[in-house]
């Protein structure tokens, strides 16, 4: 059972995938957004390639737990994605995942240019790994 992790942004979508046992998350790619149809097609292709059963998408919340405008955009995108792909989509709190991704890359001595290219993919890994850890640590 493979699970896809998404970090949906305005310009890019970070993508991660679980191992077949659902224990660990690995980065797949960062999709440069063009239009809704192409974005969904790219995600669909990845789902087919990895035989994905469900999707976990990061839900951007404010630090006080409330939902803001970006949360609405992500939820709207995921609602459309769910209809198109007919897969379960779990919304997962993504607070501080991008901060954690940046911190890990800085500690790894990656240049700013390299960090910019992969930060969303790394954030998707954090989102998916957080979900996987919650499922298997019950």
Swiss-Prot record:
Does Glycosyltransferase appear among the keywords?
Answer: no
List the GO molecular function terms.
nuclease activity
Where is it located? Cytoplasm
Statement: the UniProt record of this protein carries the keyword RNA-binding: no
Report one GO cellular component.
cytosol
* InterPro entries in alphabetical order: RNaseH-like_sf (IPR012337), YqgF (IPR005227), YqgF/RNaseH-like_dom (IPR006641), YqgF/RNaseH-like_dom_sf (IPR037027)
Q: Identify the keywords attached in UniProt to this record, alphabetized.
A: Cytoplasm, Hydrolase, Nuclease, Ribosome biogenesis
Q: What is its EC number?
A: 3.1.-.-
Give one GO biological process term: rRNA 5'-end processing
Please give the function described in this protein's UniProt entry.
Could be a nuclease involved in processing of the 5'-end of pre-16S rRNA.
The protein's name in its UniProt record: Putative pre-16S rRNA nuclease
Whose protein is this, by species? Clostridium tetani (strain Massachusetts / E88)
């Amino acid at each position: 059972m493979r699970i896809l992790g998404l970090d949906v942004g305005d310009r890019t979508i970070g993508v991660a995938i679980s191992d077949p046992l659902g224990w660990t998350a690995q980065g797949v790619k960062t999709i440069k957004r063009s239009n809704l149809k192409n974005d969904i097609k790219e995600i669909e292709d990845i789902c087919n390639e990895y035989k994905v059963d469900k999707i976990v998408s990061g839900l951007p919340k404010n630090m006080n737990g409330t939902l803001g405008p970006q949360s609405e955009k992500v939820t709207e995108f995921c609602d459309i994605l769910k209809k198109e792909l007919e897969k379960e989509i779990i919304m997962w709190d993504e607070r501080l995942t991008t901060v954690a991704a940046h911190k890990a890359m800085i500690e790894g001595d990656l240049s700013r240019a390299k960090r910019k290219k992969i930060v969303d993919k790394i954030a998707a890994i954090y989102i998916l790994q957080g979900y996987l850890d919650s499922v298997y640590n019950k």
